[in-house]
């Protein structure tokens, strides 16, 4: 019995790839290798399933979790391959697969004695690949071609007698991209010197072209080091700002405590003043009442010392006493 062939699913659309990259940018502290140190596997699995749900919400066919992970792995492999080509070009070597073997021609130089060799094709990253490059923490150098056409310069008769033929071309503007935090790509542009006029003959040996490539590589490395220093400086500035904000919060808290202590001190001072006023009023009242108490005491003592008064005889006769006293 023949086994039915497995039906191949549709390729990932741009929207699906955009959702995968967007979710990984949001969850890079959970899923990207150089960010997720110490993250448990359960949290990673939950994050991947969340990405799968978002992808299936816009996909035309249902995706599985291994497919999404495989797509992310393919995207990383493609970006790293291009970054390796750029680094090889910067360090003086040729990117794999970028030129054909036709003499010893390099970027901007001719190969062989018959004429100019093929130029190295610039490695360009799409905006999506630049975002992936930022997630991977790769610093890339991308040579963008100039809008002006490349004009070869005619050589003089003295140069034709040299061991190798040199064709000077206009060096395109080189733009250097660097990876910064929070998915930001910053670039610094090194402008090339103005091209020589086509009619001016140049007497130059082949080794001069090799020496002219080294300053470009040196400039690129200096730009990379400068970008790293700028990134470290920005991180340091962020830490300093956080420390300054923390100190400001502590200062505000200390000021609130000091104000509350001042309010408590004012309340205690007012309470002490009120107590002093009460004591003064009581002392004045005692001084006023003391003479009155003395007078009242004397009055009581004088009434106690006087004898009782004698009864009236007329009143006794009228009350039924003998009339002999009246007669």
From Swiss-Prot:
Residues 87-118, 303-327 are annotated as: Disordered. Keywords: Apoptosis, Nucleus. One of its GO terms (cellular component) is nucleus. Pfam families: Myb_DNA-bind_5. InterPro entries: Myb_DNA-bind_5. Its main location: nucleus. Residues 1-70 are annotated as: Required for nuclear localization and apoptosis-inducing activity. Disulfide bonds: none annotated. It is found in: Nucleus. Induces apoptosis. Belongs to the NAIF1 family. Interacts with HARBI1. This is Nuclear apoptosis-inducing factor 1. It comes from Macaca fascicularis.
């Amino acid at each position: 019995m023949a086994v039915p062939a497995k039906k191949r699913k549709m390729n990932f659309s741009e929207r699906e790839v955009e959702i995968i990259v967007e979710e990984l940018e949001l969850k890079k502290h959970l899923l990207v290798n150089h960010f997720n140190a110490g993250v448990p596997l359960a949290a990673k699995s939950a994050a991947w399933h969340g990405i799968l749900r978002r992808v299936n919400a816009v996909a035309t066919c249902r995706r599985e979790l291994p497919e999404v992970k495989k797509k992310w792995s393919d995207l990383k492999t493609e970006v790293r391959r291009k970054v390796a080509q750029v680094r090889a070009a910067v360090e003086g070597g040729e990117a794999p697969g970028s030129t054909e073997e036709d003499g010893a021609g390099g970027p901007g130089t001719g190969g062989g004695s018959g004429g100019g060799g093929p130029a190295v094709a610039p490695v360009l990253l799409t905006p999506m690949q630049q975002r992936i490059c930022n997630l991977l923490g790769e610093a890339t150098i991308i040579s963008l071609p100039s809008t002006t056409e490349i004009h070869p310069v005619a050589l003089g008769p003295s140069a034709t007698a040299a061991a190798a033929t040199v064709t000077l071309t206009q060096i395109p503007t080189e733009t250097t991209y660097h990876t910064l935090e929070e998915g930001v790509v910053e670039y610094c542009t090194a402008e090339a010197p103005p091209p020589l006029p086509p009619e001016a003959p140049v007497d130059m040996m082949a080794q001069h072209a090799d020496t002219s490539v080294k300053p470009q590589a040196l400039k690129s490395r200096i730009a990379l080091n400068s970008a790293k220093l700028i990134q470290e400086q920005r991180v340091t500035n962020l830490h300093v700002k956080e420390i300054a904000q923390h100190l400001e919060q502590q200062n505000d808290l200390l000021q609130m405590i000091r104000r509350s202590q001042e309010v408590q001190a004012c309340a205690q001072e007012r309470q002490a003043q009120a107590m002093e006023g009460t004591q003064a009023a009581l002392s004045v009242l005692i001084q006023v009442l003391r003479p009155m108490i003395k007078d009242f005491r004397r009055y009581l003592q004088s009434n106690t010392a006087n004898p009782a008064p004698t009864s009236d005889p007329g009143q006794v006769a009228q009350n039924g006493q003998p009339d002999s006293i009246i007669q």
